[in-house]
Amino acid sequence: MAARRDGWLGPAFGLRLLLATVLQTVSALGAEFSSESCRELGFSSNLLCSSCDLLGQFNLLQLDPDCRGCCQEEAQFETKKLYAGAILEVCGUKLGRFPQVQAFVRSDKPKLFKGLQIKYVRGSDPVLKLLDDSGNIAEELSILKWNTDSVEEFLSEKLERI
């Protein structure tokens, strides 16, 4: 009985070849999503890749591939944009539910940033509003799951220190 020469070229090989082609195409195309796709996935258009590194801290590693497809390397930002000010809004009665934000708000750290105001807004989850030179809201970010160091680091990048 003669051995079949196409044994290794059978259906399993075809499946492997198809899978390899699909993976190669996905990795080439998926390296960067459109800004619309990223918004639909819930990612900001100014997402930094260093933020994707933090997903493990919150047991969100399943989001890493999409995060990497939507993020921008820090080196892509030629100039560091500083905002004129910021408002950190939070409800005083809900502050206990967000101990990391509470620790930041009640510490001396807010005094280190020029133009940072803490506003207590009834019913509001922690939100950071960055203001342009005219005092208008340029960006608004939910900081629900941010830790104290993340808030301080972000503000260090976006506001002038006193």
From Swiss-Prot:
According to its UniProt entry, the function of this protein is described as: May be involved in redox reactions associated with the formation of disulfide bonds. May contribute to the quality control of protein folding in the endoplasmic reticulum. May regulate protein folding by enhancing the catalytic activity of UGGT1/UGCGL1 and UGGT2/UGCGL2.
Q: Can the keyword Zinc be found in this entry's annotation? A: no
Q: Which is an annotated GO molecular function term of this record? A: oxidoreductase activity
**What name does this protein carry?**
Selenoprotein F
User: In the UniProt record, does the keyword Endoplasmic reticulum occur?
Assistant: yes
Keywords for this protein = Endoplasmic reticulum, Selenocysteine, Signal
The UniProt family comment states: Belongs to the selenoprotein M/F family.
Residues annotated as signal peptide: 1-28
* InterPro entries linked: Sep15/SelM_sf, Sep15_SelM, Sep15_SelM_dom, Thioredoxin-like_sf
Note the PANTHER family from the entry. Answer: SELENOPROTEIN F (PTHR13077:SF6)
The cellular component terms of Gene Ontology attached to this UniProt record, alphabetical and capped at eight, are:
endoplasmic reticulum lumen
- Which is an annotated Pfam family here? Sep15_SelM
Q: Quote the subunit structure annotation.
A: Forms a tight complex with UGGT1/UGCGL1. Interacts with UGGT2/UGCGL2. Interacts with RDH11.
Localization in the cell: Endoplasmic reticulum lumen
